[in-house]
C-alpha cells in the first residue's frame, strides 16, 4: 500500500492496516520529538562553544551530528473521508417494530421478534438471501407468505438494500437531479451540499446516475439516506464496493446514530462496534436472539 509516499506492505485485514498505520504515525512523531530535542541541545552547544578553542573540536563534531539528524516531515494525510452523519428530527415513540410469525417460502418460517427504541441489531445467517428477503419484506419491496409485522406510527425507516442497481440503471439524470427525487427541498445548492458530503465535487455532481461505479452508487445511497432523515436505519451489506476511508466514515456515522438499526454485514468491525444485539437465522429459523456484542456472540458459539 502507498503510505506516506512510501510503499508499505501490511499483511492482514483492514483493522490490522488501520491500527498499524496509526502506530507508525505515532512512532514517527515520537522519534521526531526526540530528534527535535536533541537538535536543540546540539544547537545550544554549538552556539556556546564554537568560539572556544578548547571545545572547537567538540563543536565541530556536534555540527556533523546535527547535519545528519533526520526529522521526518509528517504531512497531513491526502486521503479523503466522506462525512456520514445520520440525523433525524422526528422523535421515536415506544413502539418501533413488531414481527410475528413472519414466513416466506424458501427463506424463513415463523420469525418473531420485537425491536425496541435502543436496539441496534446485527443479523447473522448462513444465507445472505434470507436476510435480504427479510429486509425487503419489512420495507415493502416484497410480500410475506404468512405472519405479520407492524411499524410504530413515529418510525421513518431508511433502507439501503444490498442490490441498489434499480436506483441507477438506465437513469439518465445528473446526481443533483437524481437526489432531488428524494428531497423535500429542491434548491440545487442544498442538494449539492449533500453530494459534497459524499465527495462529489461541483463537476462530479453533474455525472449521470447510470454511469456510476459501485462505490459511487453506495455513496449516493448514503447521501439519500441522510437526506431523508430516517429515524430507523436498515442496511444490507453497506460496505460493498466502498474504499477504506468511506468504510471508516460509515462506521463512525452508525456508531453516532441515535435511533434503532438493523444491520447485515460481513465487516466484523462494523458489526462489533455498532450492534448490541445479535439475531441468528439458520435454516430459515431464528436460532439465537440476545443482547450481546458480536465478539461475545462468537465466543459463545465457539464454546
Whereabouts are the PLM-identified features?
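ABC ATP-binding cassette signature C-motif
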Residues: 1-30, 89-303
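Flexible nucleotide-interacting loop at or near the entrance of a catalytic core
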Residues: 20-110
